Regions:
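Intrinsically disordered, low-complexity Pro/Gly/Ser/Thr-rich segments with frequent PxxP/GP/PP motifs
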Residues: 280-310, 733-764, 878-908
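Substrate-binding clefts and catalytic carboxylate motifs of secreted carbohydrate-active enzymes
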Residues: 35-51, 145, 213-216, 542-720, ...
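Accessory beta-strand-rich segments of carbohydrate-active enzymes
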Residues: 16, 27-30, 47-49, 77-78, ...
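Substrate-binding/catalytic cleft of secreted carbohydrate-active enzymes
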Residues: 408-598, 635, 639, 650, ...
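Terminal connector regions
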Residues: 307-340, 758-811, 904-932
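Active-site-adjacent substrate/metal-binding segments within catalytic domains
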Residues: 80-128, 136-141, 147-152, 162, ...
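Beta-strand-rich binding/interaction modules
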Residues: 153, 246-287, 293-295, 707-745, ...
Length: 932
């Protein structure tokens, strides 16, 4: 008899296959009783169109898998998707180049059931495993599937696809009575994913649709072995004092008795602070036959669980990331039967509504971490297009995020493997987790079985997230939950002891229990830089505040649309024909945007038409791919910088402060031209460096709404002796104005507006520069250069309100930049051995100097690290070091000025070559220097 996985305190063990409560097993990998199937032998994968035998036959030990695809577990411990299996076995080399994916597999153009024949049928996943020792209980743990699955063990069906469905719903089956000595076999028949009818996942409009709809297994399939007592589901419920002076920790662990007789054991808990003395407590627990008991350790019963002066976990810009270790064990007769181990952090999160205001009558969402108000500054996460998880790739992207200065990553659905959260904990990056929009997660009614999957998913997700200090909130997406969904989810989260905070929507919606979300969304396509400073335009008839994207409140997803990578990156994924279309045909559908065709109004993002139209009108027409890419870099830079700076600048507004911006999206799971701050090869283009500049820890902002200067301190300590100098130049390099603030002192997270008001030109059609120089105790710590026109961008608000892109009355006239004279640039570079992010072991230091004899600006100067020769010549082909991670770039210098940039990289990336730095710019010819 199959028992529901939702809401049970115990279930019969040892009576044959059945579905057991999620509490029977840790969601983490830190249990000695749990192992990942396929870790040793891998998996065999094949379409049912070829493997036509029955599940009973395929799951029989000794079944021949000759000709099947061989697939190891990925870095998250799972066999992955069907397309991933094909790629690993040689199908479609260079799948992301141009339209290779479409050529190899076909293309879907609508989210829904798979329309590609080879993926519209079930596929088999098969692996062998060894029997546990005699007398040991064995449970099969399926941690969700993308699609639905029939499960077979040793010739017997354990579960049907009616039970095993849901990307995050955990199912546990007792298979003790099915196993034989020696080799045993598991076969899983994966039925095609349909995100419009299943509680799974999809890619919305973020990219091309994966040809297999991501059908497969993205989380580990596990075997839990133990007897007679098994400990699991261990976690900490913390109550931390408001002033952070103490933290009372309640520890809970479930102990399961797998035998037919009552059992007594000693349950021990050890909490170890970083570098500190372990705290160990224990108690005896008697568990009835074939049942599970929650053993609780409270601070009142065990006073040592109240920690005085705890080590507090902070976001990386504010402090350290100490992680405590929680270890539990169950023993009988002095012998430990099994144990668990995982980490947790001590910190507080405060979520509130600030306001109200005319635009936001219920207030706007705001967050404090450890009582410190912070402006959330982040981006949306997109996993690999085929859900291939690689811990090294996560580490590389963390390096990119921290170098960029963002503090948050948002998960809209696509919840991640355990390693991902562990890395975010260690890195100090905040995680805004939640459900996905626009699919079955937002359906308004479910069957009884679907209700069960929804609640089981929430419980499993809660178990995964609850101990991770990086996860500071969980929210629904576009739509607020129905009353039924809200109850199911909150019941599931409560069963997991996951405290949230929970937000009812990513838009300005509300739900019966959680109330007002206080968030908004959009825009998603090109808007001018000064759009981000708007605080007064919104659609009064749209209560969700969609596309009211100015810098007020909390915007859960927004950006200026398409981003153009560097030429190095473009050459890795666009064919010559693709490249020609990129710079010659703005209305062309770009395969590496998404599947939406050639529309460019409303919610259609398949072309770069709106971006290109703005570039043409603002900077002038281009005559080559390289010129187009350069102009796009400049425009992307100024737009992303403005988005993040505006939200910091307006965080001081009292009525409706800017409290957070999530760039849509931070990354992509494939090479892209749409919504990304860095490409999947680590490419750092103009969009990246614009955000990086905006998020410098001590930074000056030229506010585009009132032409004054703001200074902010986004670091964790007070900065005193700070001055801000504002210099205004014309395009000939003449200084038109030069003002310096008085000495300033800024506490952590302090934002000071109007510290300087530079005098800028007013004559018509005049292009000018503003250079901001921040010094502390006389030392330069921040440079920020703007280019602007007295012919400004003017948004047609009556036509723009409610739209995902701006309709323009007038574009800024920056075409005079085309006439800048050539500048003379020199550079020096040195390399030292130094550890860096993601395995980097070298640091290159580059000093770029403008040596022009006349006052000619060196505009938008970029340095790149390349493979070359000892004489300073670049090697041919793709010579960029993709592991390089830059501290700053795309800088602008006047004669006599220098800027020192640094980059970390992996020496192995040189492949025996000499490191060479190239420097080029808008009006500077390319030079190369050896980084000796």
């Amino acid at each position: 008899v199959a028992l529901t996985a939702v809401g049970l305190a115990s279930a019969s063990a040892g009576a044959g296959p059945g579905v057991f409560p999620a509490a029977f097993v840790d969601p983490s990998t830190g249990s000695s009783a749990v192992s990942n199937l396929g870790a040793t032998n891998g998996w065999k994968v094949l379409t049912s169109a070829t493997a036509t035998q029955s599940g009973a036959t395929i799951s029989t030990p000794g079944f021949s898998t000759s000709g099947w695809l061989t697939v190891p577990n990925d870095g998250g411990g799972a066999p992955g998707t069907e397309v991933s299996a094909l790629l690993q076995n040689g199908t479609c080399p260079n799948v992301f180049m141009s339209t290779n994916m479409k050529t190899c597999f076909g293309q879907m153009t609508k989210v829904g059931a798979d329309t590609i024949p080879q993926f519209a049928v079930p596929w088999w996943y098969r692996t062998d495993f060894s029997a546990p020792p005699a007398g040991q209980d064995a449970k099969l743990v399926v941690n969700g599937v993308v699609g639905a699955a029939d499960v077979w063990v040793d010739g017997s069906q354990v579960a049907t696809s009616a039970t095993v469905t849901g990307a995050y719903a955990r199912n546990v089956f007792d298979i003790t009575g099915l196993l034989r000595s020696g080799t045993n076999s598991l076969a899983i028949e994966m039925h095609p994913n349909d995100p419009t009818k299943m509680l799974t996942l999809d890619n919305v409009d973020w990219s091309q649709i994966p040809p297999d709809n991501n059908t497969g297994i993205q989380f580990p399939v596990q075997l839990q072995v133990g007897s007679p007592l098994v400990v699991g589901n261990a976690h900490v419920v913390q109550s931390t004092a408001t002033n952070l002076s103490s933290s009372a920790l309640t520890v809970k662990a479930d102990v399961t008795n797998t035998s037919s007789a009552s059992q007594t054991g000693t349950v021990a808990v050890t909490i170890t602070p970083p570098g500190g003395t372990p705290i160990t407590v224990s108690q005896s627990a008697t568990v009835a036959a074939n049942s599970t008991k929650t053993v609780t350790f409270t601070p009142s019963a065990f006073p040592s669980l109240t920690i005085t002066g705890p080590q507090i976990w902070w976001p990386y810009q504010l402090g350290a990331q100490p992680l405590y270790t929680l270890a539990t064990s169950v023993a009988q007769g002095g012998t430990t039967l099994n144990s668990t181990s995982e980490t947790f952090g001590i910190r507080t999160v405060t979520s509130s509504l600030v306001g109200p205001s005319t635009a936001a009558p219920s207030g706007v969402r705001a967050f404090k971490i450890n009582n410190v108000p912070i402006v959330i500054r982040g981006g949306g996460w997109d996993p690999d297009l085929f859900l291939r998880y690689d811990p090294a790739d996560t580490a590389k992207q963390i390096g990119l995020m921290k170098a960029m200065g963002v503090n948050t990553v948002r998960l809209e659905g696509h919840l991640a493997p355990a390693d991902w959260y562990q890395q975010m904990d260690a890195a100090g990056i905040l995680v805004n987790a939640g459900y996905q929009c626009c699919n079955f997660w937002e359906a308004t009614s479910y069957t009884t079985a679907q209700n069960a999957v929804y609640q089981a998913s929430a419980q499993a997700v809660g178990q995964t997230l609850r101990n991770h200090p990086s996860v500071f909130s969980f929210q629904w997406s576009d739509n607020a939950p129905t009353a039924n969904q809200e109850t199911l989810a909150l019941n599931g989260f409560a069963a997991a002891d996951y405290p949230g905070p929970f937000i009812s929507s990513a838009e300005y919606n509300s739900s019966p229990q959680l109330g007002a979300a206080g968030e908004k969304e959009g825009p998603y396509d090109w808007v001018p830089p000064n759009y981000w400073y708007d605080t007064s335009h919104f659609d009064s008839g749209d209560s969700t505040l969609t596309n009211a994207g100015g810098s007020w409140g909390f915007d859960s997803e927004q950006s200026g649309g398409h981003t153009v990578p560097t030429l190095d990156s473009i050459n890795r994924f666009l064919s010559s024909a693709d490249q020609s279309a990129l710079w010659q045909t703005p209305s062309a559908n770009q395969f590496h945007a998404n599947y939406e065709g050639t529309g460019h109004t409303g919610y259609a993002f398949g072309t770069l038409f709106n971006l290109d139209t703005a570039i043409t009108n603002r900077y002038g027409a281009w005559s080559s791919l390289s010129q187009y890419v350069e102009e796009a870099q400049v425009q992307n830079y100024e737009d992303t910088r403005a988005q993040f700076e505006a939200f910091v600048d307006h965080s001081t507004n009292s009525a409706a402060p800017a409290t957070g911006t999530i760039y849509w999206q931070m990354n992509k799971g494939w090479p892209t031209l749409l919504w990304s701050l860095y490409n999947n090869d680590g490419d750092q283009a103009g969009a990246y460096f614009g955000v990086q500049k905006a998020n410098k820890p001590l930074h000056a902002i030229f506010a585009l709404d009132d032409k004054t200067v703001t200074v902010d301190n986004l670091g964790g300590t007070t900065r005193s002796g700070v001055t801000v100098e504002a210099k205004v130049y014309n395009t000939a390099g003449t200084v038109l104005d030069d003002k310096t603030s008085g000495s300033l002192s800024l506490a952590s997270q302090k934002v000071m507006n109007k510290v300087v008001t530079p005098t800028v030109p007013t004559a018509a059609n005049t292009v000018y520069f503003v250079e901001l120089l921040v010094r502390q105790n006389g030392n330069l710590v921040d440079r920020n250069v703007y280019w602007a026109s007295t012919t400004p961008d003017i948004t047609n608000w009556s036509s723009t309100i409610g739209q995902p892109q701006a309709v323009m009355t007038q574009y800024a006239n920056l075409k005079a930049l085309q006439s800048l004279p050539q500048s003379s640039i020199t550079a020096t570079a040195t390399t030292t051995s130094q550890a860096g992010p993601a395995g980097a072991d070298r640091l290159v230091t580059v000093t770029v100097t403008n040596n022009s004899a006349t006052p000619t600006v060196g505009f938008f100067l970029r340095a790149d690290l390349r493979r070359g020769t000892a004489s300073g010549t670049e090697l041919s082909g793709d010579n960029e070091l993709q592991s390089s991670l830059w501290s700053d770039n795309d800088v602008t210098l006047w004669p006599g000025e220098s800027e020192t940039l640094t980059a970390t990289y992996k020496s192995a990336d040189l492949q025996g070559a000499t490191p060479v730095v190239s420097v080029s710019g808008w009006n500077a010819p390319r030079i190369d220097v050896v980084a000796g």
